[in-house]
A protein has these predicted regions:
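Conserved beta strand-loop-helix elements of the APE1-like EEP
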Residues: 97-104
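A conserved glycine-rich beta-strand in the N-terminal activation segment of trypsin-fold
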Residues: 6-22, 91
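Extracellular/periplasmic catalytic domains that process cell-envelope and extracellular macromolecules
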Residues: 19, 42-45, 68, 89-93, ...
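Sequence contexts marking disulfide-bonded cysteines in secreted/extracellular proteins
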Residues: 16, 30-33, 98
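Conserved H-D interstitial segment of serine endopeptidase catalytic domains
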Residues: 3-6, 25-28, 32-85
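Active-site substrate-binding loop(s) of clan PA
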Residues: 35-39, 79-88, 104-141
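Hydrophobic, repeat-rich solenoid/adaptor surfaces of innate immune receptors and signaling proteins
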Residues: 19-20, 26, 100
């Protein structure tokens, strides 16, 4: 799953994410913040962005072999705080965002909704809880 900026000469991958409903993607707030800032500057809507799914290979995304769905809305966590570089604080706080899509992906063998693990009481996870993540970003800080 990736979010892409449309430019005829440039296939710019903005960020990766996970399909949490047929029409919703869970991703990082720092990715969504960039999209929101650029849309405010240029056209005040998300028509230049779309979400693609269906292959783990970035080259396949670039060659348009996967479905492409426009973005309808972006919801950044209300307590998101980006890293503060000049204070050497490289960790973002509440770096989470949900992207709502214009319509749903068709669920196939290659496109699936992730199964989010919740504890019984829907409480916050304990510090140092073992988790699995996916994406094409940094693998260490």
């Amino acid at each position: 799953m990736l979010v892409q900026y449309h430019d005829p000469d440039l296939h710019d991958v903005t960020c990766s994410g996970s399909l949490i409903k047929e029409n919703a993607v869970l991703t990082a707030a720092h990715c969504c913040e960039v999209i929101q800032n650029l849309t405010k500057i240029y056209n005040d809507n998300y028509t230049d962005y779309s979400v693609l799914a269906g292959t783990p290979d970035l080259k396949s995304f670039i060659h348009k072999v996967s479905p492409e769905i426009p973005i309808k809305a972006i919801y950044i966590h209300e307590n998101y705080r980006p890293p503060i570089e000049n204070e050497n604080d490289l960790a973002a706080i509440n770096d989470i965002c949900i992207i709502k899509l214009e319509h749903s992906f068709n669920i196939t063998n290659d496109i699936q909704v992730v199964q989010l693990q919740m504890n019984k009481n829907r409480e916050n996870l304990e510090i140092e809880t073992h988790c699995h993540v996916s994406g094409w970003g940094l693998d260490e800080v």
